[in-house]
Curated annotation (Swiss-Prot):
Keywords: Cleavage on pair of basic residues, Disulfide bond, Neuropeptide, Neurotransmitter, Opioid peptide, Repeat, Secreted, Signal. It comes from Rattus norvegicus. This is Prepronociceptin. Residues 112-125 have a biased composition (Acidic residues). Specific enzymatic cleavages at paired basic residues probably yield other active peptides besides nociceptin. The gene is Pnoc.
Length: 181
């Protein structure tokens, strides 16, 4: 185990001394010939520069570059696809919440709509607000609050304007009636 660890360490040190990570990742991409969109070049570079750990994609690249042949052995395509899809899986972590949302939607659809009670509507509202909070739906609440504040501000402005215009018209009438105009 120590020998394997030392070999990997030596290989990573040599690769960082004699080459650059973007070139190595481009070479790796050419040698592996992955499906379009399955090879993430940025992730490979980050793994090469040891900024991301674990590094399944980069270890696959070092194996591919270490081999003299242009193609990998028949046993390695499984390893190739596993490493490539593992990097994609790390990008898809946010999709773990989808089953919870799906179950809420299915439960809501399963309820009979004809027998809807006000209590059920309130429960749906509470559930919807919780989902809205959990999945970042705050913008709608903020937007409506801003809209309401703008309406209040505008109505206050209009009220002041109307009061001033009424006072102004009353002054004109009184001045006109007194003959001061």
């Amino acid at each position: 185990m120590k020998i394997l660890f030392c070999d990997v360490l030596l290989l990573s040190l040599l690769s960082s001394v004699f080459s650059s990570c973007p070139e190595d990742c481009l070479t790796c991409q050419e040698r592996l010939h992955p499906a379009p969109g399955s090879f993430n070049l940025k992730l490979c570079i980050l793994q090469c520069e040891e900024k991301v750990f674990p590094r399944p994609l980069w270890t696959l690249c070092t194996k591919a570059m270490a081999s003299d042949s242009e193609q990998l052995s028949p046993a390695d395509p499984e390893l190739t696809s596993a490493a490539l899809y593992q990097s994609k899986a790390s990008e898809m972590q946010h999709l773990k919440r989808m089953p919870r949302v799906r179950s809420v939607v299915q439960a809501r659809d399963a309820e009979p709509e004809a027998d809807a009670e006000p209590v059920a509507d309130e429960a749906d509202e509470v559930e919807q607000k919780q989902l809205q909070k959990r999945f970042g739906g705050f913008t709608g609440a903020r937007k409506s609050a801003r809209k309401l504040a703008n309406q209040k501000r505008f109505s206050e402005f209009m009220r002041q304007y109307l009061v001033l215009s009424m006072q102004s018209s009353q002054r004109r009438r009184t001045l006109h009636q007194n003959g001061n105009v």
